[in-house]
């Protein structure tokens, strides 16, 4: 199949985990009714974003949140990218995205590789590494439509990850992410367009809706960018479902017109992956 419908759920996240899960599943069902084949939730869809919240909201996989995601994926026969949740495993915490297939089975689990440790004086200081551990693996999954590569938020800043995914046959990269009011206006769309053009892939980002009262205010603006670098659709700041019909014929045409993937100079440079 050369076309499919992608849905990004820009969820308004509250401090009540059960409400977040229930609302997320409701919006997933709505997206499926509108013909979505692949649906993505945002980063930290079941909890507020913050190092003080991660230990409190963390759960094992499978657990409360992922069991519900499995059920709703199977109920609606869709591929569901479960945004991310704080995951507890063997005494460590991770920022983890679980993906479920139309049969409800877990396809892959991506743990955020690059932790969000930044300091922009006078604007924002954040250190995920205070409570989280980094993942150490690449994460892709196959659908009847295309191969999908996964990253979470800060992972998008690292071009090497996207390059490796493209080399491994991914045609769509999905980054559940929660950029903030400093980095969002500066880099959110820029990075998506860069990753799309550099690798001639579709790039999609699913953000939480903006909550001005939250301790961490998300930028919002979930987005889909095509391999030409064109923004196909972009949300505002409120809770919504963003739809985009992905055309893989267009991707093939762009790769034929500007064949950069075949023109790379492996005799001069390379991006090396140290793990499978």
UniProtKB/Swiss-Prot annotation:
Residues 4-248 form the CN hydrolase domain. Gene3D superfamilies: Carbon-nitrogen hydrolase (3.60.110.10). InterPro entries: C-N_Hydrolase (IPR003010), C-N_Hydrolase_sf (IPR036526), Nit1/2_C-N_Hydrolase (IPR045254). GO terms for molecular function: 2-oxoglutaramate amidase activity; omega-amidase activity. The modification N6-acetyllysine is found at residue 68. CDD domains: nit. It is found in: Cytoplasm. It comes from the Eukaryota. The modification Phosphoserine is found at residue 26. The active site is at residues 43, 112, 153. Its EC number is 3.5.1.3. GO terms for cellular component: cytoplasm. Belongs to the carbon-nitrogen hydrolase superfamily. NIT1/NIT2 family. This is Omega-amidase NIT2. It comes from Rattus norvegicus. The gene is Nit2.
């Amino acid at each position: 199949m050369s076309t499919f419908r992608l849905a990004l759920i820009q969820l308004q996240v509250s401090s009540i985990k059960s409400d977040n899960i229930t609302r997320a599943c409701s919006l997933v069902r709505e997206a499926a009714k509108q013909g979505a084949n692949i649906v993505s939730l945002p980063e930290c869809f079941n909890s507020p974003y913050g190092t003080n919240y991660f230990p409190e909201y963390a759960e094992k996989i499978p657990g409360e949140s992922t069991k519900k995601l499995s059920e709703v994926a199977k109920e609606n026969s869709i591929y569901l990218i479960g945004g991310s949740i704080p995951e507890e495993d063997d005494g460590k915490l991770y920022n983890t995205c679980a993906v479920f297939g139309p049969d409800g089975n877990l396809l892959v689990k991506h743990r955020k590789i690059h932790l969000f440790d930044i300091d922009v004086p006078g604007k924002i200081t954040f250190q995920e590494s205070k409570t989280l551990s980094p993942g150490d693996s690449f994460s892709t999954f196959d659908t009847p439509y295309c191969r999908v590569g996964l990253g979470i938020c800060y992972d998008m800043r690292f071009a090497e990850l996207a390059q490796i995914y493209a080399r491994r046959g991914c045609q769509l990269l999905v980054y559940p992410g929660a950029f903030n009011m400093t980095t969002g206006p500066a880099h959110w769309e820029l990075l998506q367009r860069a990753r799309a053009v550099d690798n001639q892939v579709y790039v999609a980002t699913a953000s939480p809706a903006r909550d001005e009262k939250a301790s961490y205010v998300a930028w919002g603006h979930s987005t889909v960018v095509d391999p030409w670098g064109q923004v196909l659709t972009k949300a505002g700041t409120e809770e919504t479902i963003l739809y985009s019909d992905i055309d893989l014929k267009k991707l093939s045409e762009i790769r034929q017109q500007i064949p950069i993937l075949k023109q790379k100079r492996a005799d001069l440079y390379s991006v090396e992956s140290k793990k499978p």
